[in-house]
Amino acid sequence: MFYNQTVDKGKLKKLIAWAYQNYGSARCSQMADELKNLGFRFATKAGVSISVDDLTVPPAKRQMIESAEQEIRQTEQRYVRGEITEVERFQKVIDTWNSTSESLKDEVIRNFQVTDPLNSVYMMAFSGARGNMSQVRQLVGMRGLMANPQGEIIDLPIKTNFREGLTVTEYVISSYGARKGLVDTALRTADSGYLTRRLVDVSQDVIVREADCGTNRYVELTAMTDGDRVLIPLSDRLLGRSLAEDVVVNGEVIATRNQIIDDETAEKLGRLVDKIKVRSPLTCEAARSVCQTCYGWSLAHGHPVDMGEAVGIIAAQSIGEPGTQLTMRTFHTGGVFTGEVARQVRSPFEGTVRFLPGLSIRNVRTRHGDERDQVEAPGEIKLTPKDKTKETVTYSLTPGSLLFVTDGETVSEEQLLAEITSDKVQKSTEKATKDVTSDLAGEVLFSQLVPEEKTDRQGNTTRIAQRGGLLWILSGEVYNLPPGAEPVVSNGDQVQVGDVLAETKLVSTNGGLVRLAPNSREIDIVTASVSLDQAEVKVESSAGREQFIIHTGDGQSFLLKTTPGTKVQNHAIVAELIDDRYQTHTGGMIKYVDIEVAKGSRKQGYEITKGGTILWIPEETHEVNKDISLLQVEDGQYVEAGEEVVKDIFCNSSGVVEVIQKNDILREIIVKPGLLFMDLEPESSGIAQEQLIYPGTQLTPEVTIEELRQAEWVETNEGLGLLLRPVQEFTVQDQSTSPTQGSANQEGGRHIELRSVQRIFFKDGERVKSVEGCQLISTQLVLEISSEEPESVSHLTADIELEPIEDRDCQRLQLVILESLVLRRDSDNDPLGGNIQTRVLVQDGDEIPPGAVVARTEIQCKEAGEIRGIRKGSEAVRRLLIVSDRDEFILPLAVAPTVKARDLVIAEAEIAAGVLAPNSGQVLAVDKTATGYEIRLRKARPYRVSAGAILHIDEGDLVQRGDNLVLLVFERSKTGDIIQGLPRIEELLEARKPKEACVLARKPGVCQVEYQDSEIVDIKVVEDDGTISEYPLLGSQNPLVSDNQRIDVGQALTDGQANPHEILEVFFNYYVDSLGSYEAALKALEKTQMFLVDQVQSVYQSQGIDIADKHIEVIVRQMTSKVRIDDGGDTSMLPGELLELRQVETVNEAMSITGGAAAKYTPVLLGITKASLNTDSFISAASFQETTRVLTEAAIEGKSDWLRGLKENVIIGRLIPAGTGFNSHENTAGISDYTPPEEEYNYNNRSYYAPPGGLGLPPRPGFGDSSEDSDMILDDQTARAYAEGDVVDLEDDEMAFLSSRGSSRFSRQPISDRWSEADEEGEEDDFEEDYEEE
């Protein structure tokens, strides 16, 4: 065979595939080796390598980039003149650079072909040996546009290539994309690996177990297209499939049912027919497997698939492996960069254009801001050549196409005639926004712009441009006024540099004594103060901490409770008297006599309002909280001081013990000191519980009480006794004395003092649980601030200061109320606010009245000019404007101008005969001079605003440079599929709802589309039986159907991704009434299956990856095989159970024979994770996810695992039922321990090697001839078998081993009798079902 052509990568692939198909792998690999040697030999001879000289930049590049830049300069000027909006400018820039980059790429290729076809770079890239076009483009073309981290395209392209070298800016821009690529790759590997794992899990039990299931069902295959482009031709999709019925063309049978299509037949059928019915794993009726005929070829060999082939795992790997190559991320290009699918039509020759009748057009504004004619209904244009030898050409135009020529226009060769939009591609658009910021400071003026206020439901008002127009910024210097500043000039004033424009006053609210530290930013004003003039403060340190002690004139000592230099609130405690008059030695009980206290808190203590006596009955309380077994004494026992009451706890005083316990936990031990008398009775002695016994009371003739006691009857281990407990008395004065204090300048009606307060910490009758002792009463100095206006007191604080006393080493305590005022910092060069100067108007030590001005901040003018833009009243704005000479320019004219004062002039507009304005501006005045005229203009800048834009500013507002002016709202084509690549594959296979699902028609009918004013669209469908269904649309959804259009069931009415669950539901509900549940479920599942297969294919195709349909079909089959039981009827099935559709239908058929009620069900679509967890085998499900849940459920339900898949068998450690282990699986499919006697040792029934024709099939002719290089895969069993040329007699012990392996394969002792007869897998299934029912 002789080919005379250049062999590149593609041709090489085909050559090797042909050799493999025809001559097997051994010869093919030998040929591949020889080809490799050939390649290397000639590459070495030729010296193919890349050097810098090979990277030739096409000479036309410079000129191409210059023309692109020229086009962009024009666009920029149009933008500056206000002819196009920011969005249109951006779009034009992006499109210009894109087309330049593309045409440069073509130029690179042309340049190589013409000048140096043997260039190493060119040869490598185009033969497919190394590199690709996009890399070559970056080496010698231009790198093109890049996206920023948010995915928006940066409108600064990288014009250089790697051969010329990048500038710093370009390098930084391009590093965004590079980093993104690396991160993406890292994320992709993990994602794709997990996807493969889930796919394997869901399909691992799909094994070819039958030769032919005999089904009559089929799927229809057509070529896969995207718009006009054919992604996968029909011939490619047919290869290796079995036909479902004979193909007859013009009465001739081209191919028959069940024929597997090879290359030739596929080519032939692809030419002759558009759609073809084939068998598919989706429709295969083999139970829990796929049959050979439905699967077709094993694509690895180009022969029918072998029995026992694990096609599920092959499918999973075929889909999972390319996952890494899919792009992960959505490059959302900030959208303006559209994937507009418009075909450009250029004139092939010079000629005249004619519009044919029936072509209806209307004028539109294109996305570049140009006015063009757009085609409304399909029509045609005709091009008549100037050269009569050529033929007239007619072009058909689709609606939405743009015309670049007029009727009757003469066109030159290669002139652009029209951009034809593809009618197949549904143009889905979405709303997007873009901010426009101001390029100069000044005031705002609207021209032809009509604003309109809209209020939404929340009551927020937005201002929207009702009609588009120009928004002008008239130049001027804008000053931002600080808060509180009042302008001291008015509109129209002329100001010079350094004049004060506005000022802020700093006012003291309270007045008082001024304290001003040098170089400080704060002015402190003392409004009131108090000092302890007779007391000294000394610093003493105890336990390593400094303490401030106040010694008063009358010998009292106070401890300062706050640190000097800090602020204290009103009513805060400043100091506490040091005294131990009210200190107890242990805990005890407290009783008030004549004492009255004010309300207060436990933490602060209760203030004593009236003096009296405190009675204190001491007792020692140990809080223990230990086990009762540690107790060393008994309840009621008398203990001596120092005795151990609980392990490691000793009492300090003698007395009677009271034990408090709860639930065998020892809570408290109380030791009550006192005198214990045992020989008294309560009745005879007349002493009540808790009675006070006064001194001199005679208890018995021998005993007289010396001091005050409290009586308590206690139970001891010797009987009832009387305990007389000691009582301490503490006398409390009505009020304590305050140290003398002098106060100064109590201005503004304020008064400040330190008040002495006695506070008691325990309530009347309270028990103090303690061993040590406590302070009962404390005397405190409290800060009291009072004022004529009580509400102004709450926020006042006082500062604690220590003033040194002359010629003594101690200090005096002083409390002052300060008002602190902070001065503004001066700034000479605030770019937005003028020069700011602050002047202080007071001196240190001044006395000032309330309301006095302490300092004044002035905003000074930086440039001479006229004041504008001050507003009064409610409209007051914190800005003012100065129009200086820099903002104006003068044009001398020789002729009379055509403009008058206040006119707005756009750059390059005519202002007098033959005179164009150099800049845009507003005419201030037109003056006549000796030589002619003089126009004075104020610089200005127009911005084009499209209708519907959101305005951030109003007419007359003052804006700084960089302020937002408007938010342009525009429609952009959704860039491709917003979710691409892996995430989309995952969304499909996990059967997730898409984010913005489209609306599907539930019944066929005729559409009625109504557009309401507020951009809301109503779609109603008049169904065939006359019912009208309404389909509500969300705001973001655009209708895809037009008024009076006929629609079919399940058709998408709006843009967006279809939700597969909804497809299933819509079709099932539509068919169920006419066809019954089973057929409806099959039909609905088929629609969903085809949708999923096509969607997955299109994602892989968009990345240029080819996957055979059958792999996806195997996976989708696993996702769509189950139904959910709605009502079990008379069967044993439970509502909500997920079961195989065929299994349910078998039971229902049995029910219809016996007359029982059939089960009702709905088909369900399970994502791959869900399907893996709902598989028949609980071992497989448990080893995938949620192990504990799966195993506990299986245990509760008493499930059996039939060990059909690969995974279950691997886990349990047996042969897998695929490949070489398939036969043993088949023959033992129902074997119990019972074996028929005549077969006992006849192992010839079971061959231990696989003939090359595939297991279970007759061997290939010529098998065993050495003449043919057969492809064989040997394992040790097969090898032994081959060695003798026949099946070997195995040793007895090996036989025993094998037979034990064989019989244990399905050893089910408890129900063995049921299985002894069952030999076929199908029967086994029926048994399993019957068994489950019973």
Swiss-Prot record:
One of its GO terms (molecular function) is DNA binding. It catalyses: RNA(n) + a ribonucleoside 5'-triphosphate = RNA(n+1) + diphosphate. SUPFAM superfamilies: beta and beta-prime subunits of DNA dependent RNA-polymerase, Pyrimidine nucleoside phosphorylase C-terminal domain. Keywords: DNA-directed RNA polymerase, Metal-binding, Nucleotidyltransferase, Transcription, Transferase, Zinc. Its cofactor is Zn(2+). Gene3D superfamilies: 1.10.132.30, 1.10.150.390, 1.10.1790.20, 2.40.50.100, RNA polymerase Rpb1, domain 3. Binds 1 Zn(2+) ion per subunit. One of its GO terms (cellular component) is DNA-directed RNA polymerase complex. Residues 1299-1308 have a biased composition (Low complexity). Residues 1318-1334 have a biased composition (Acidic residues). Its EC number is 2.7.7.6. GO terms for biological process: DNA-templated transcription; pyrimidine nucleoside metabolic process. Residues 1299-1334 are annotated as: Disordered. Zn(2+) binds at C213, C284, C291, C294. Pfam families: RNA_pol_Rpb1_3, RNA_pol_Rpb1_4, RNA_pol_Rpb1_5. In cyanobacteria the RNAP catalytic core is composed of 2 alpha, 1 beta, 1 beta', 1 gamma and 1 omega subunit. When a sigma factor is associated with the core the holoenzyme is formed, which can initiate transcription. DNA-dependent RNA polymerase catalyzes the transcription of DNA into RNA using the four ribonucleoside triphosphates as substrates. Belongs to the RNA polymerase beta' chain family. RpoC2 subfamily. HAMAP family: RNApol_bact_RpoC2 (MF_01324). This is DNA-directed RNA polymerase subunit beta'. It comes from Microcystis aeruginosa (strain NIES-843 / IAM M-2473).
